[in-house]
């Protein structure tokens, strides 16, 4: 499918630089492809058309007792590193690296800038600027150089010692569309983290989850909505542009995830008794769809997934999706177009832009019903 079909114009002022306060006061666009045609309209109590405007705190009224929300409990780490590259004893040059996937106790895949300056065998001293050392030695060797600035870094430290050094030296890797407008600050350490984050390893937040508050959790509990947690460590590749002209030619980035046997069994039980699987965020959806068999049964999962969902994909397990508003030409806009329908999502985004919804990581949310349900 042509990538330019997923393009659209977004005014700069629609990009959110800070989250709504409180978190669940963000707007919620409910997108129900079936509402106008009638047969499924009763499943959306307040929606008289395919698109209806609400707030995140209204979420319980769109769900039924016995439905299950699936959250990604990954925790963002300060994965943005600044350092000095050394080669053959010569003077150093400043470089930056964004860690995006751990591949061993001391090894990480990272995106380095400027990538052209880096070669295999280079040494990088992170936490240093010129001759000054800020926070101890976090040194690495460039073990391998790939495409698009990707490198494999072998750190001198390992295990918990490496984690502590990264936490001391690193910065929260704000998405490029925010970082281009303002620097990271102390507020982002809290704002760019879900309230239920517990499994360290992400370099980008599962942003749909940023809208949840203790009060919203209490309302969902009262409504009989189940909560289940899976883990997908979101990588920096989520921000990579699609450079191919056709979706068939795009190579999807890998992200590592985990679905326990217990959670798989609980979600299958929800489906068996007629409940719906409602994924909070595209990351939990991609993980659940990776773990699901052709029969729709969810299996335990541990490993990397590079699932790339575009229109024509047949969803196996997920019934509804809550997600933020995504970038033009992005793999995530392709995913939501597959989920609720290409024309439906183009109309939804046109409506969101014209009525002042806030886009991207700190922006508003949408609740999507699956087009083939």
Swiss-Prot record:
- Write out the GO biological process terms: queuosine biosynthetic process; tRNA wobble guanine modification
Its predominant location is cytoplasm
Please, which domain of life does this record's source organism belong to?
Bacteria
Q: Which terms in the Gene Ontology molecular function aspect does this entry carry?
A: S-adenosylmethionine:tRNA ribosyltransferase-isomerase activity
Task: Spell out the reaction equation it catalyses.
Answer: 7-aminomethyl-7-carbaguanosine(34) in tRNA + S-adenosyl-L-methionine = epoxyqueuosine(34) in tRNA + adenine + L-methionine + 2 H(+)
Entry keyword Signal: no
- What name does this protein carry? S-adenosylmethionine:tRNA ribosyltransferase-isomerase
As for what it does, the entry says: Transfers and isomerizes the ribose moiety from AdoMet to the 7-aminomethyl group of 7-deazaguanine (preQ1-tRNA) to give epoxyqueuosine (oQ-tRNA).
What NCBIfam families does the record point to? PRK00147.1, queA
Query: Which Gene3D superfamilies does the protein's record reference?
Result: QueA-like
Q: Could you tell me where this protein is found in the cell? A: Cytoplasm
